């Protein structure tokens, strides 16, 4: 009988590696890789996965990549967890510095924290030696010990942390001090140049710029350019119809400390003017008053634009006779004001009419009486009877008589 052939020996281990063998890393992991794997595990978010089971699978994989149970013992994995908790309990700035050194164990992390504390303490002691004693002593002590020697360990650690936290803020404080000094110097320079402001305003007033309608009257006034008169004097021209008086209250406001009145600006023909041509400004009163007054006719204006338009009428000089009364005026604006007197003159009183059947009837054609000739003083003439009247209202009342009797 032939011997039975032996079956081929099956492999002791499968050809495909297990998941644990896939994740295993024969070489030791560097601190940077361990920290990166820890962050991926701690910062995992649920919405990245498509479901709860997939999220648990990813967390399981990330945790194995971080702790590596196939390459580390239980004590090593516990040390990683304790190291993470220890670093999380440190202050933020100290934790950042210790993590940058890459400690592999809790003892290394504790040594780094101790070294950092000693370095900061030495820096604080050096800074305390440079400070004057009176800044730290609040009184004379009998034992003669310095305040630094009486500090407890907890207070020293607080000083160390304060020094570490205040270190990056020093450049910002120095920049702030430089900015403050610059602002103070600019403010001092502005105060020194303040007396030159009136001169600048005066030179600006000579420019032929049209002022804005939004400017307030008080903003357009120049301090020394106001026309100040004595108490009870009239601010108007000899021929002007309007006049205003300055009250003693306003007069006292415009006197200087020595009690003298400031000189007024006068309008000169063809010459250089210190302010607007022909301006005589009333002393500044309460808000909403009329500060602009014409020196030629005495008219007062609230806005400078109206005042400038009024000044144009004074440039046309010459004899202007009144067509009504024959008076002659030097300026056209004065003639315009004078003409209002004739236009607003009240009409003459009419004789009372007799109410009754025997009302006066105008004469018929061929029996008219003498008709008053038309003259410049009687420009309004009736087209029915030929009578002339000096006022339009008289002619209208006269024409009502013809209308009542059917002659029109």
From Swiss-Prot:
Domain (SCAN box) spans 38-120
GO terms assigned for molecular function: DNA-binding transcription factor activity, RNA polymerase II-specific; RNA polymerase II cis-regulatory region sequence-specific DNA binding; sequence-specific double-stranded DNA binding; zinc ion binding
Mind telling me which SMART domains this protein's record contains?
Answer: SCAN, ZnF_C2H2
Question: Which UniProt keywords are given for this protein, alphabetically ordered?
Answer: DNA-binding, Metal-binding, Nucleus, Repeat, Transcription, Transcription regulation, Zinc, Zinc-finger
Q: Where in the cell is it found?
A: Nucleus
Q: Mind telling me which GO cellular component terms the entry cites?
A: chromatin; nucleus
Q: Which PROSITE patterns match?
A: SCAN_BOX (PS50804), ZINC_FINGER_C2H2_1 (PS00028), ZINC_FINGER_C2H2_2 (PS50157)
Q: Where is this region: Disordered?
A: 1-34, 136-155, 177-203, 215-273, 344-379
Q: Name one GO biological process term.
A: regulation of transcription by RNA polymerase II
Q: State the signal peptide span.
A: none
| Residues in C2H2-type zinc fingers | 292-314, 320-342, 380-402
Any single Pfam family the record assigns to this protein: zf-C2H2
Provide the function of this protein: May be involved in transcriptional regulation.
> How is this protein named in the record?
Zinc finger and SCAN domain-containing protein 1
**Species, as recorded:** Homo sapiens (Human)
Report the gene name. Answer: ZSCAN1
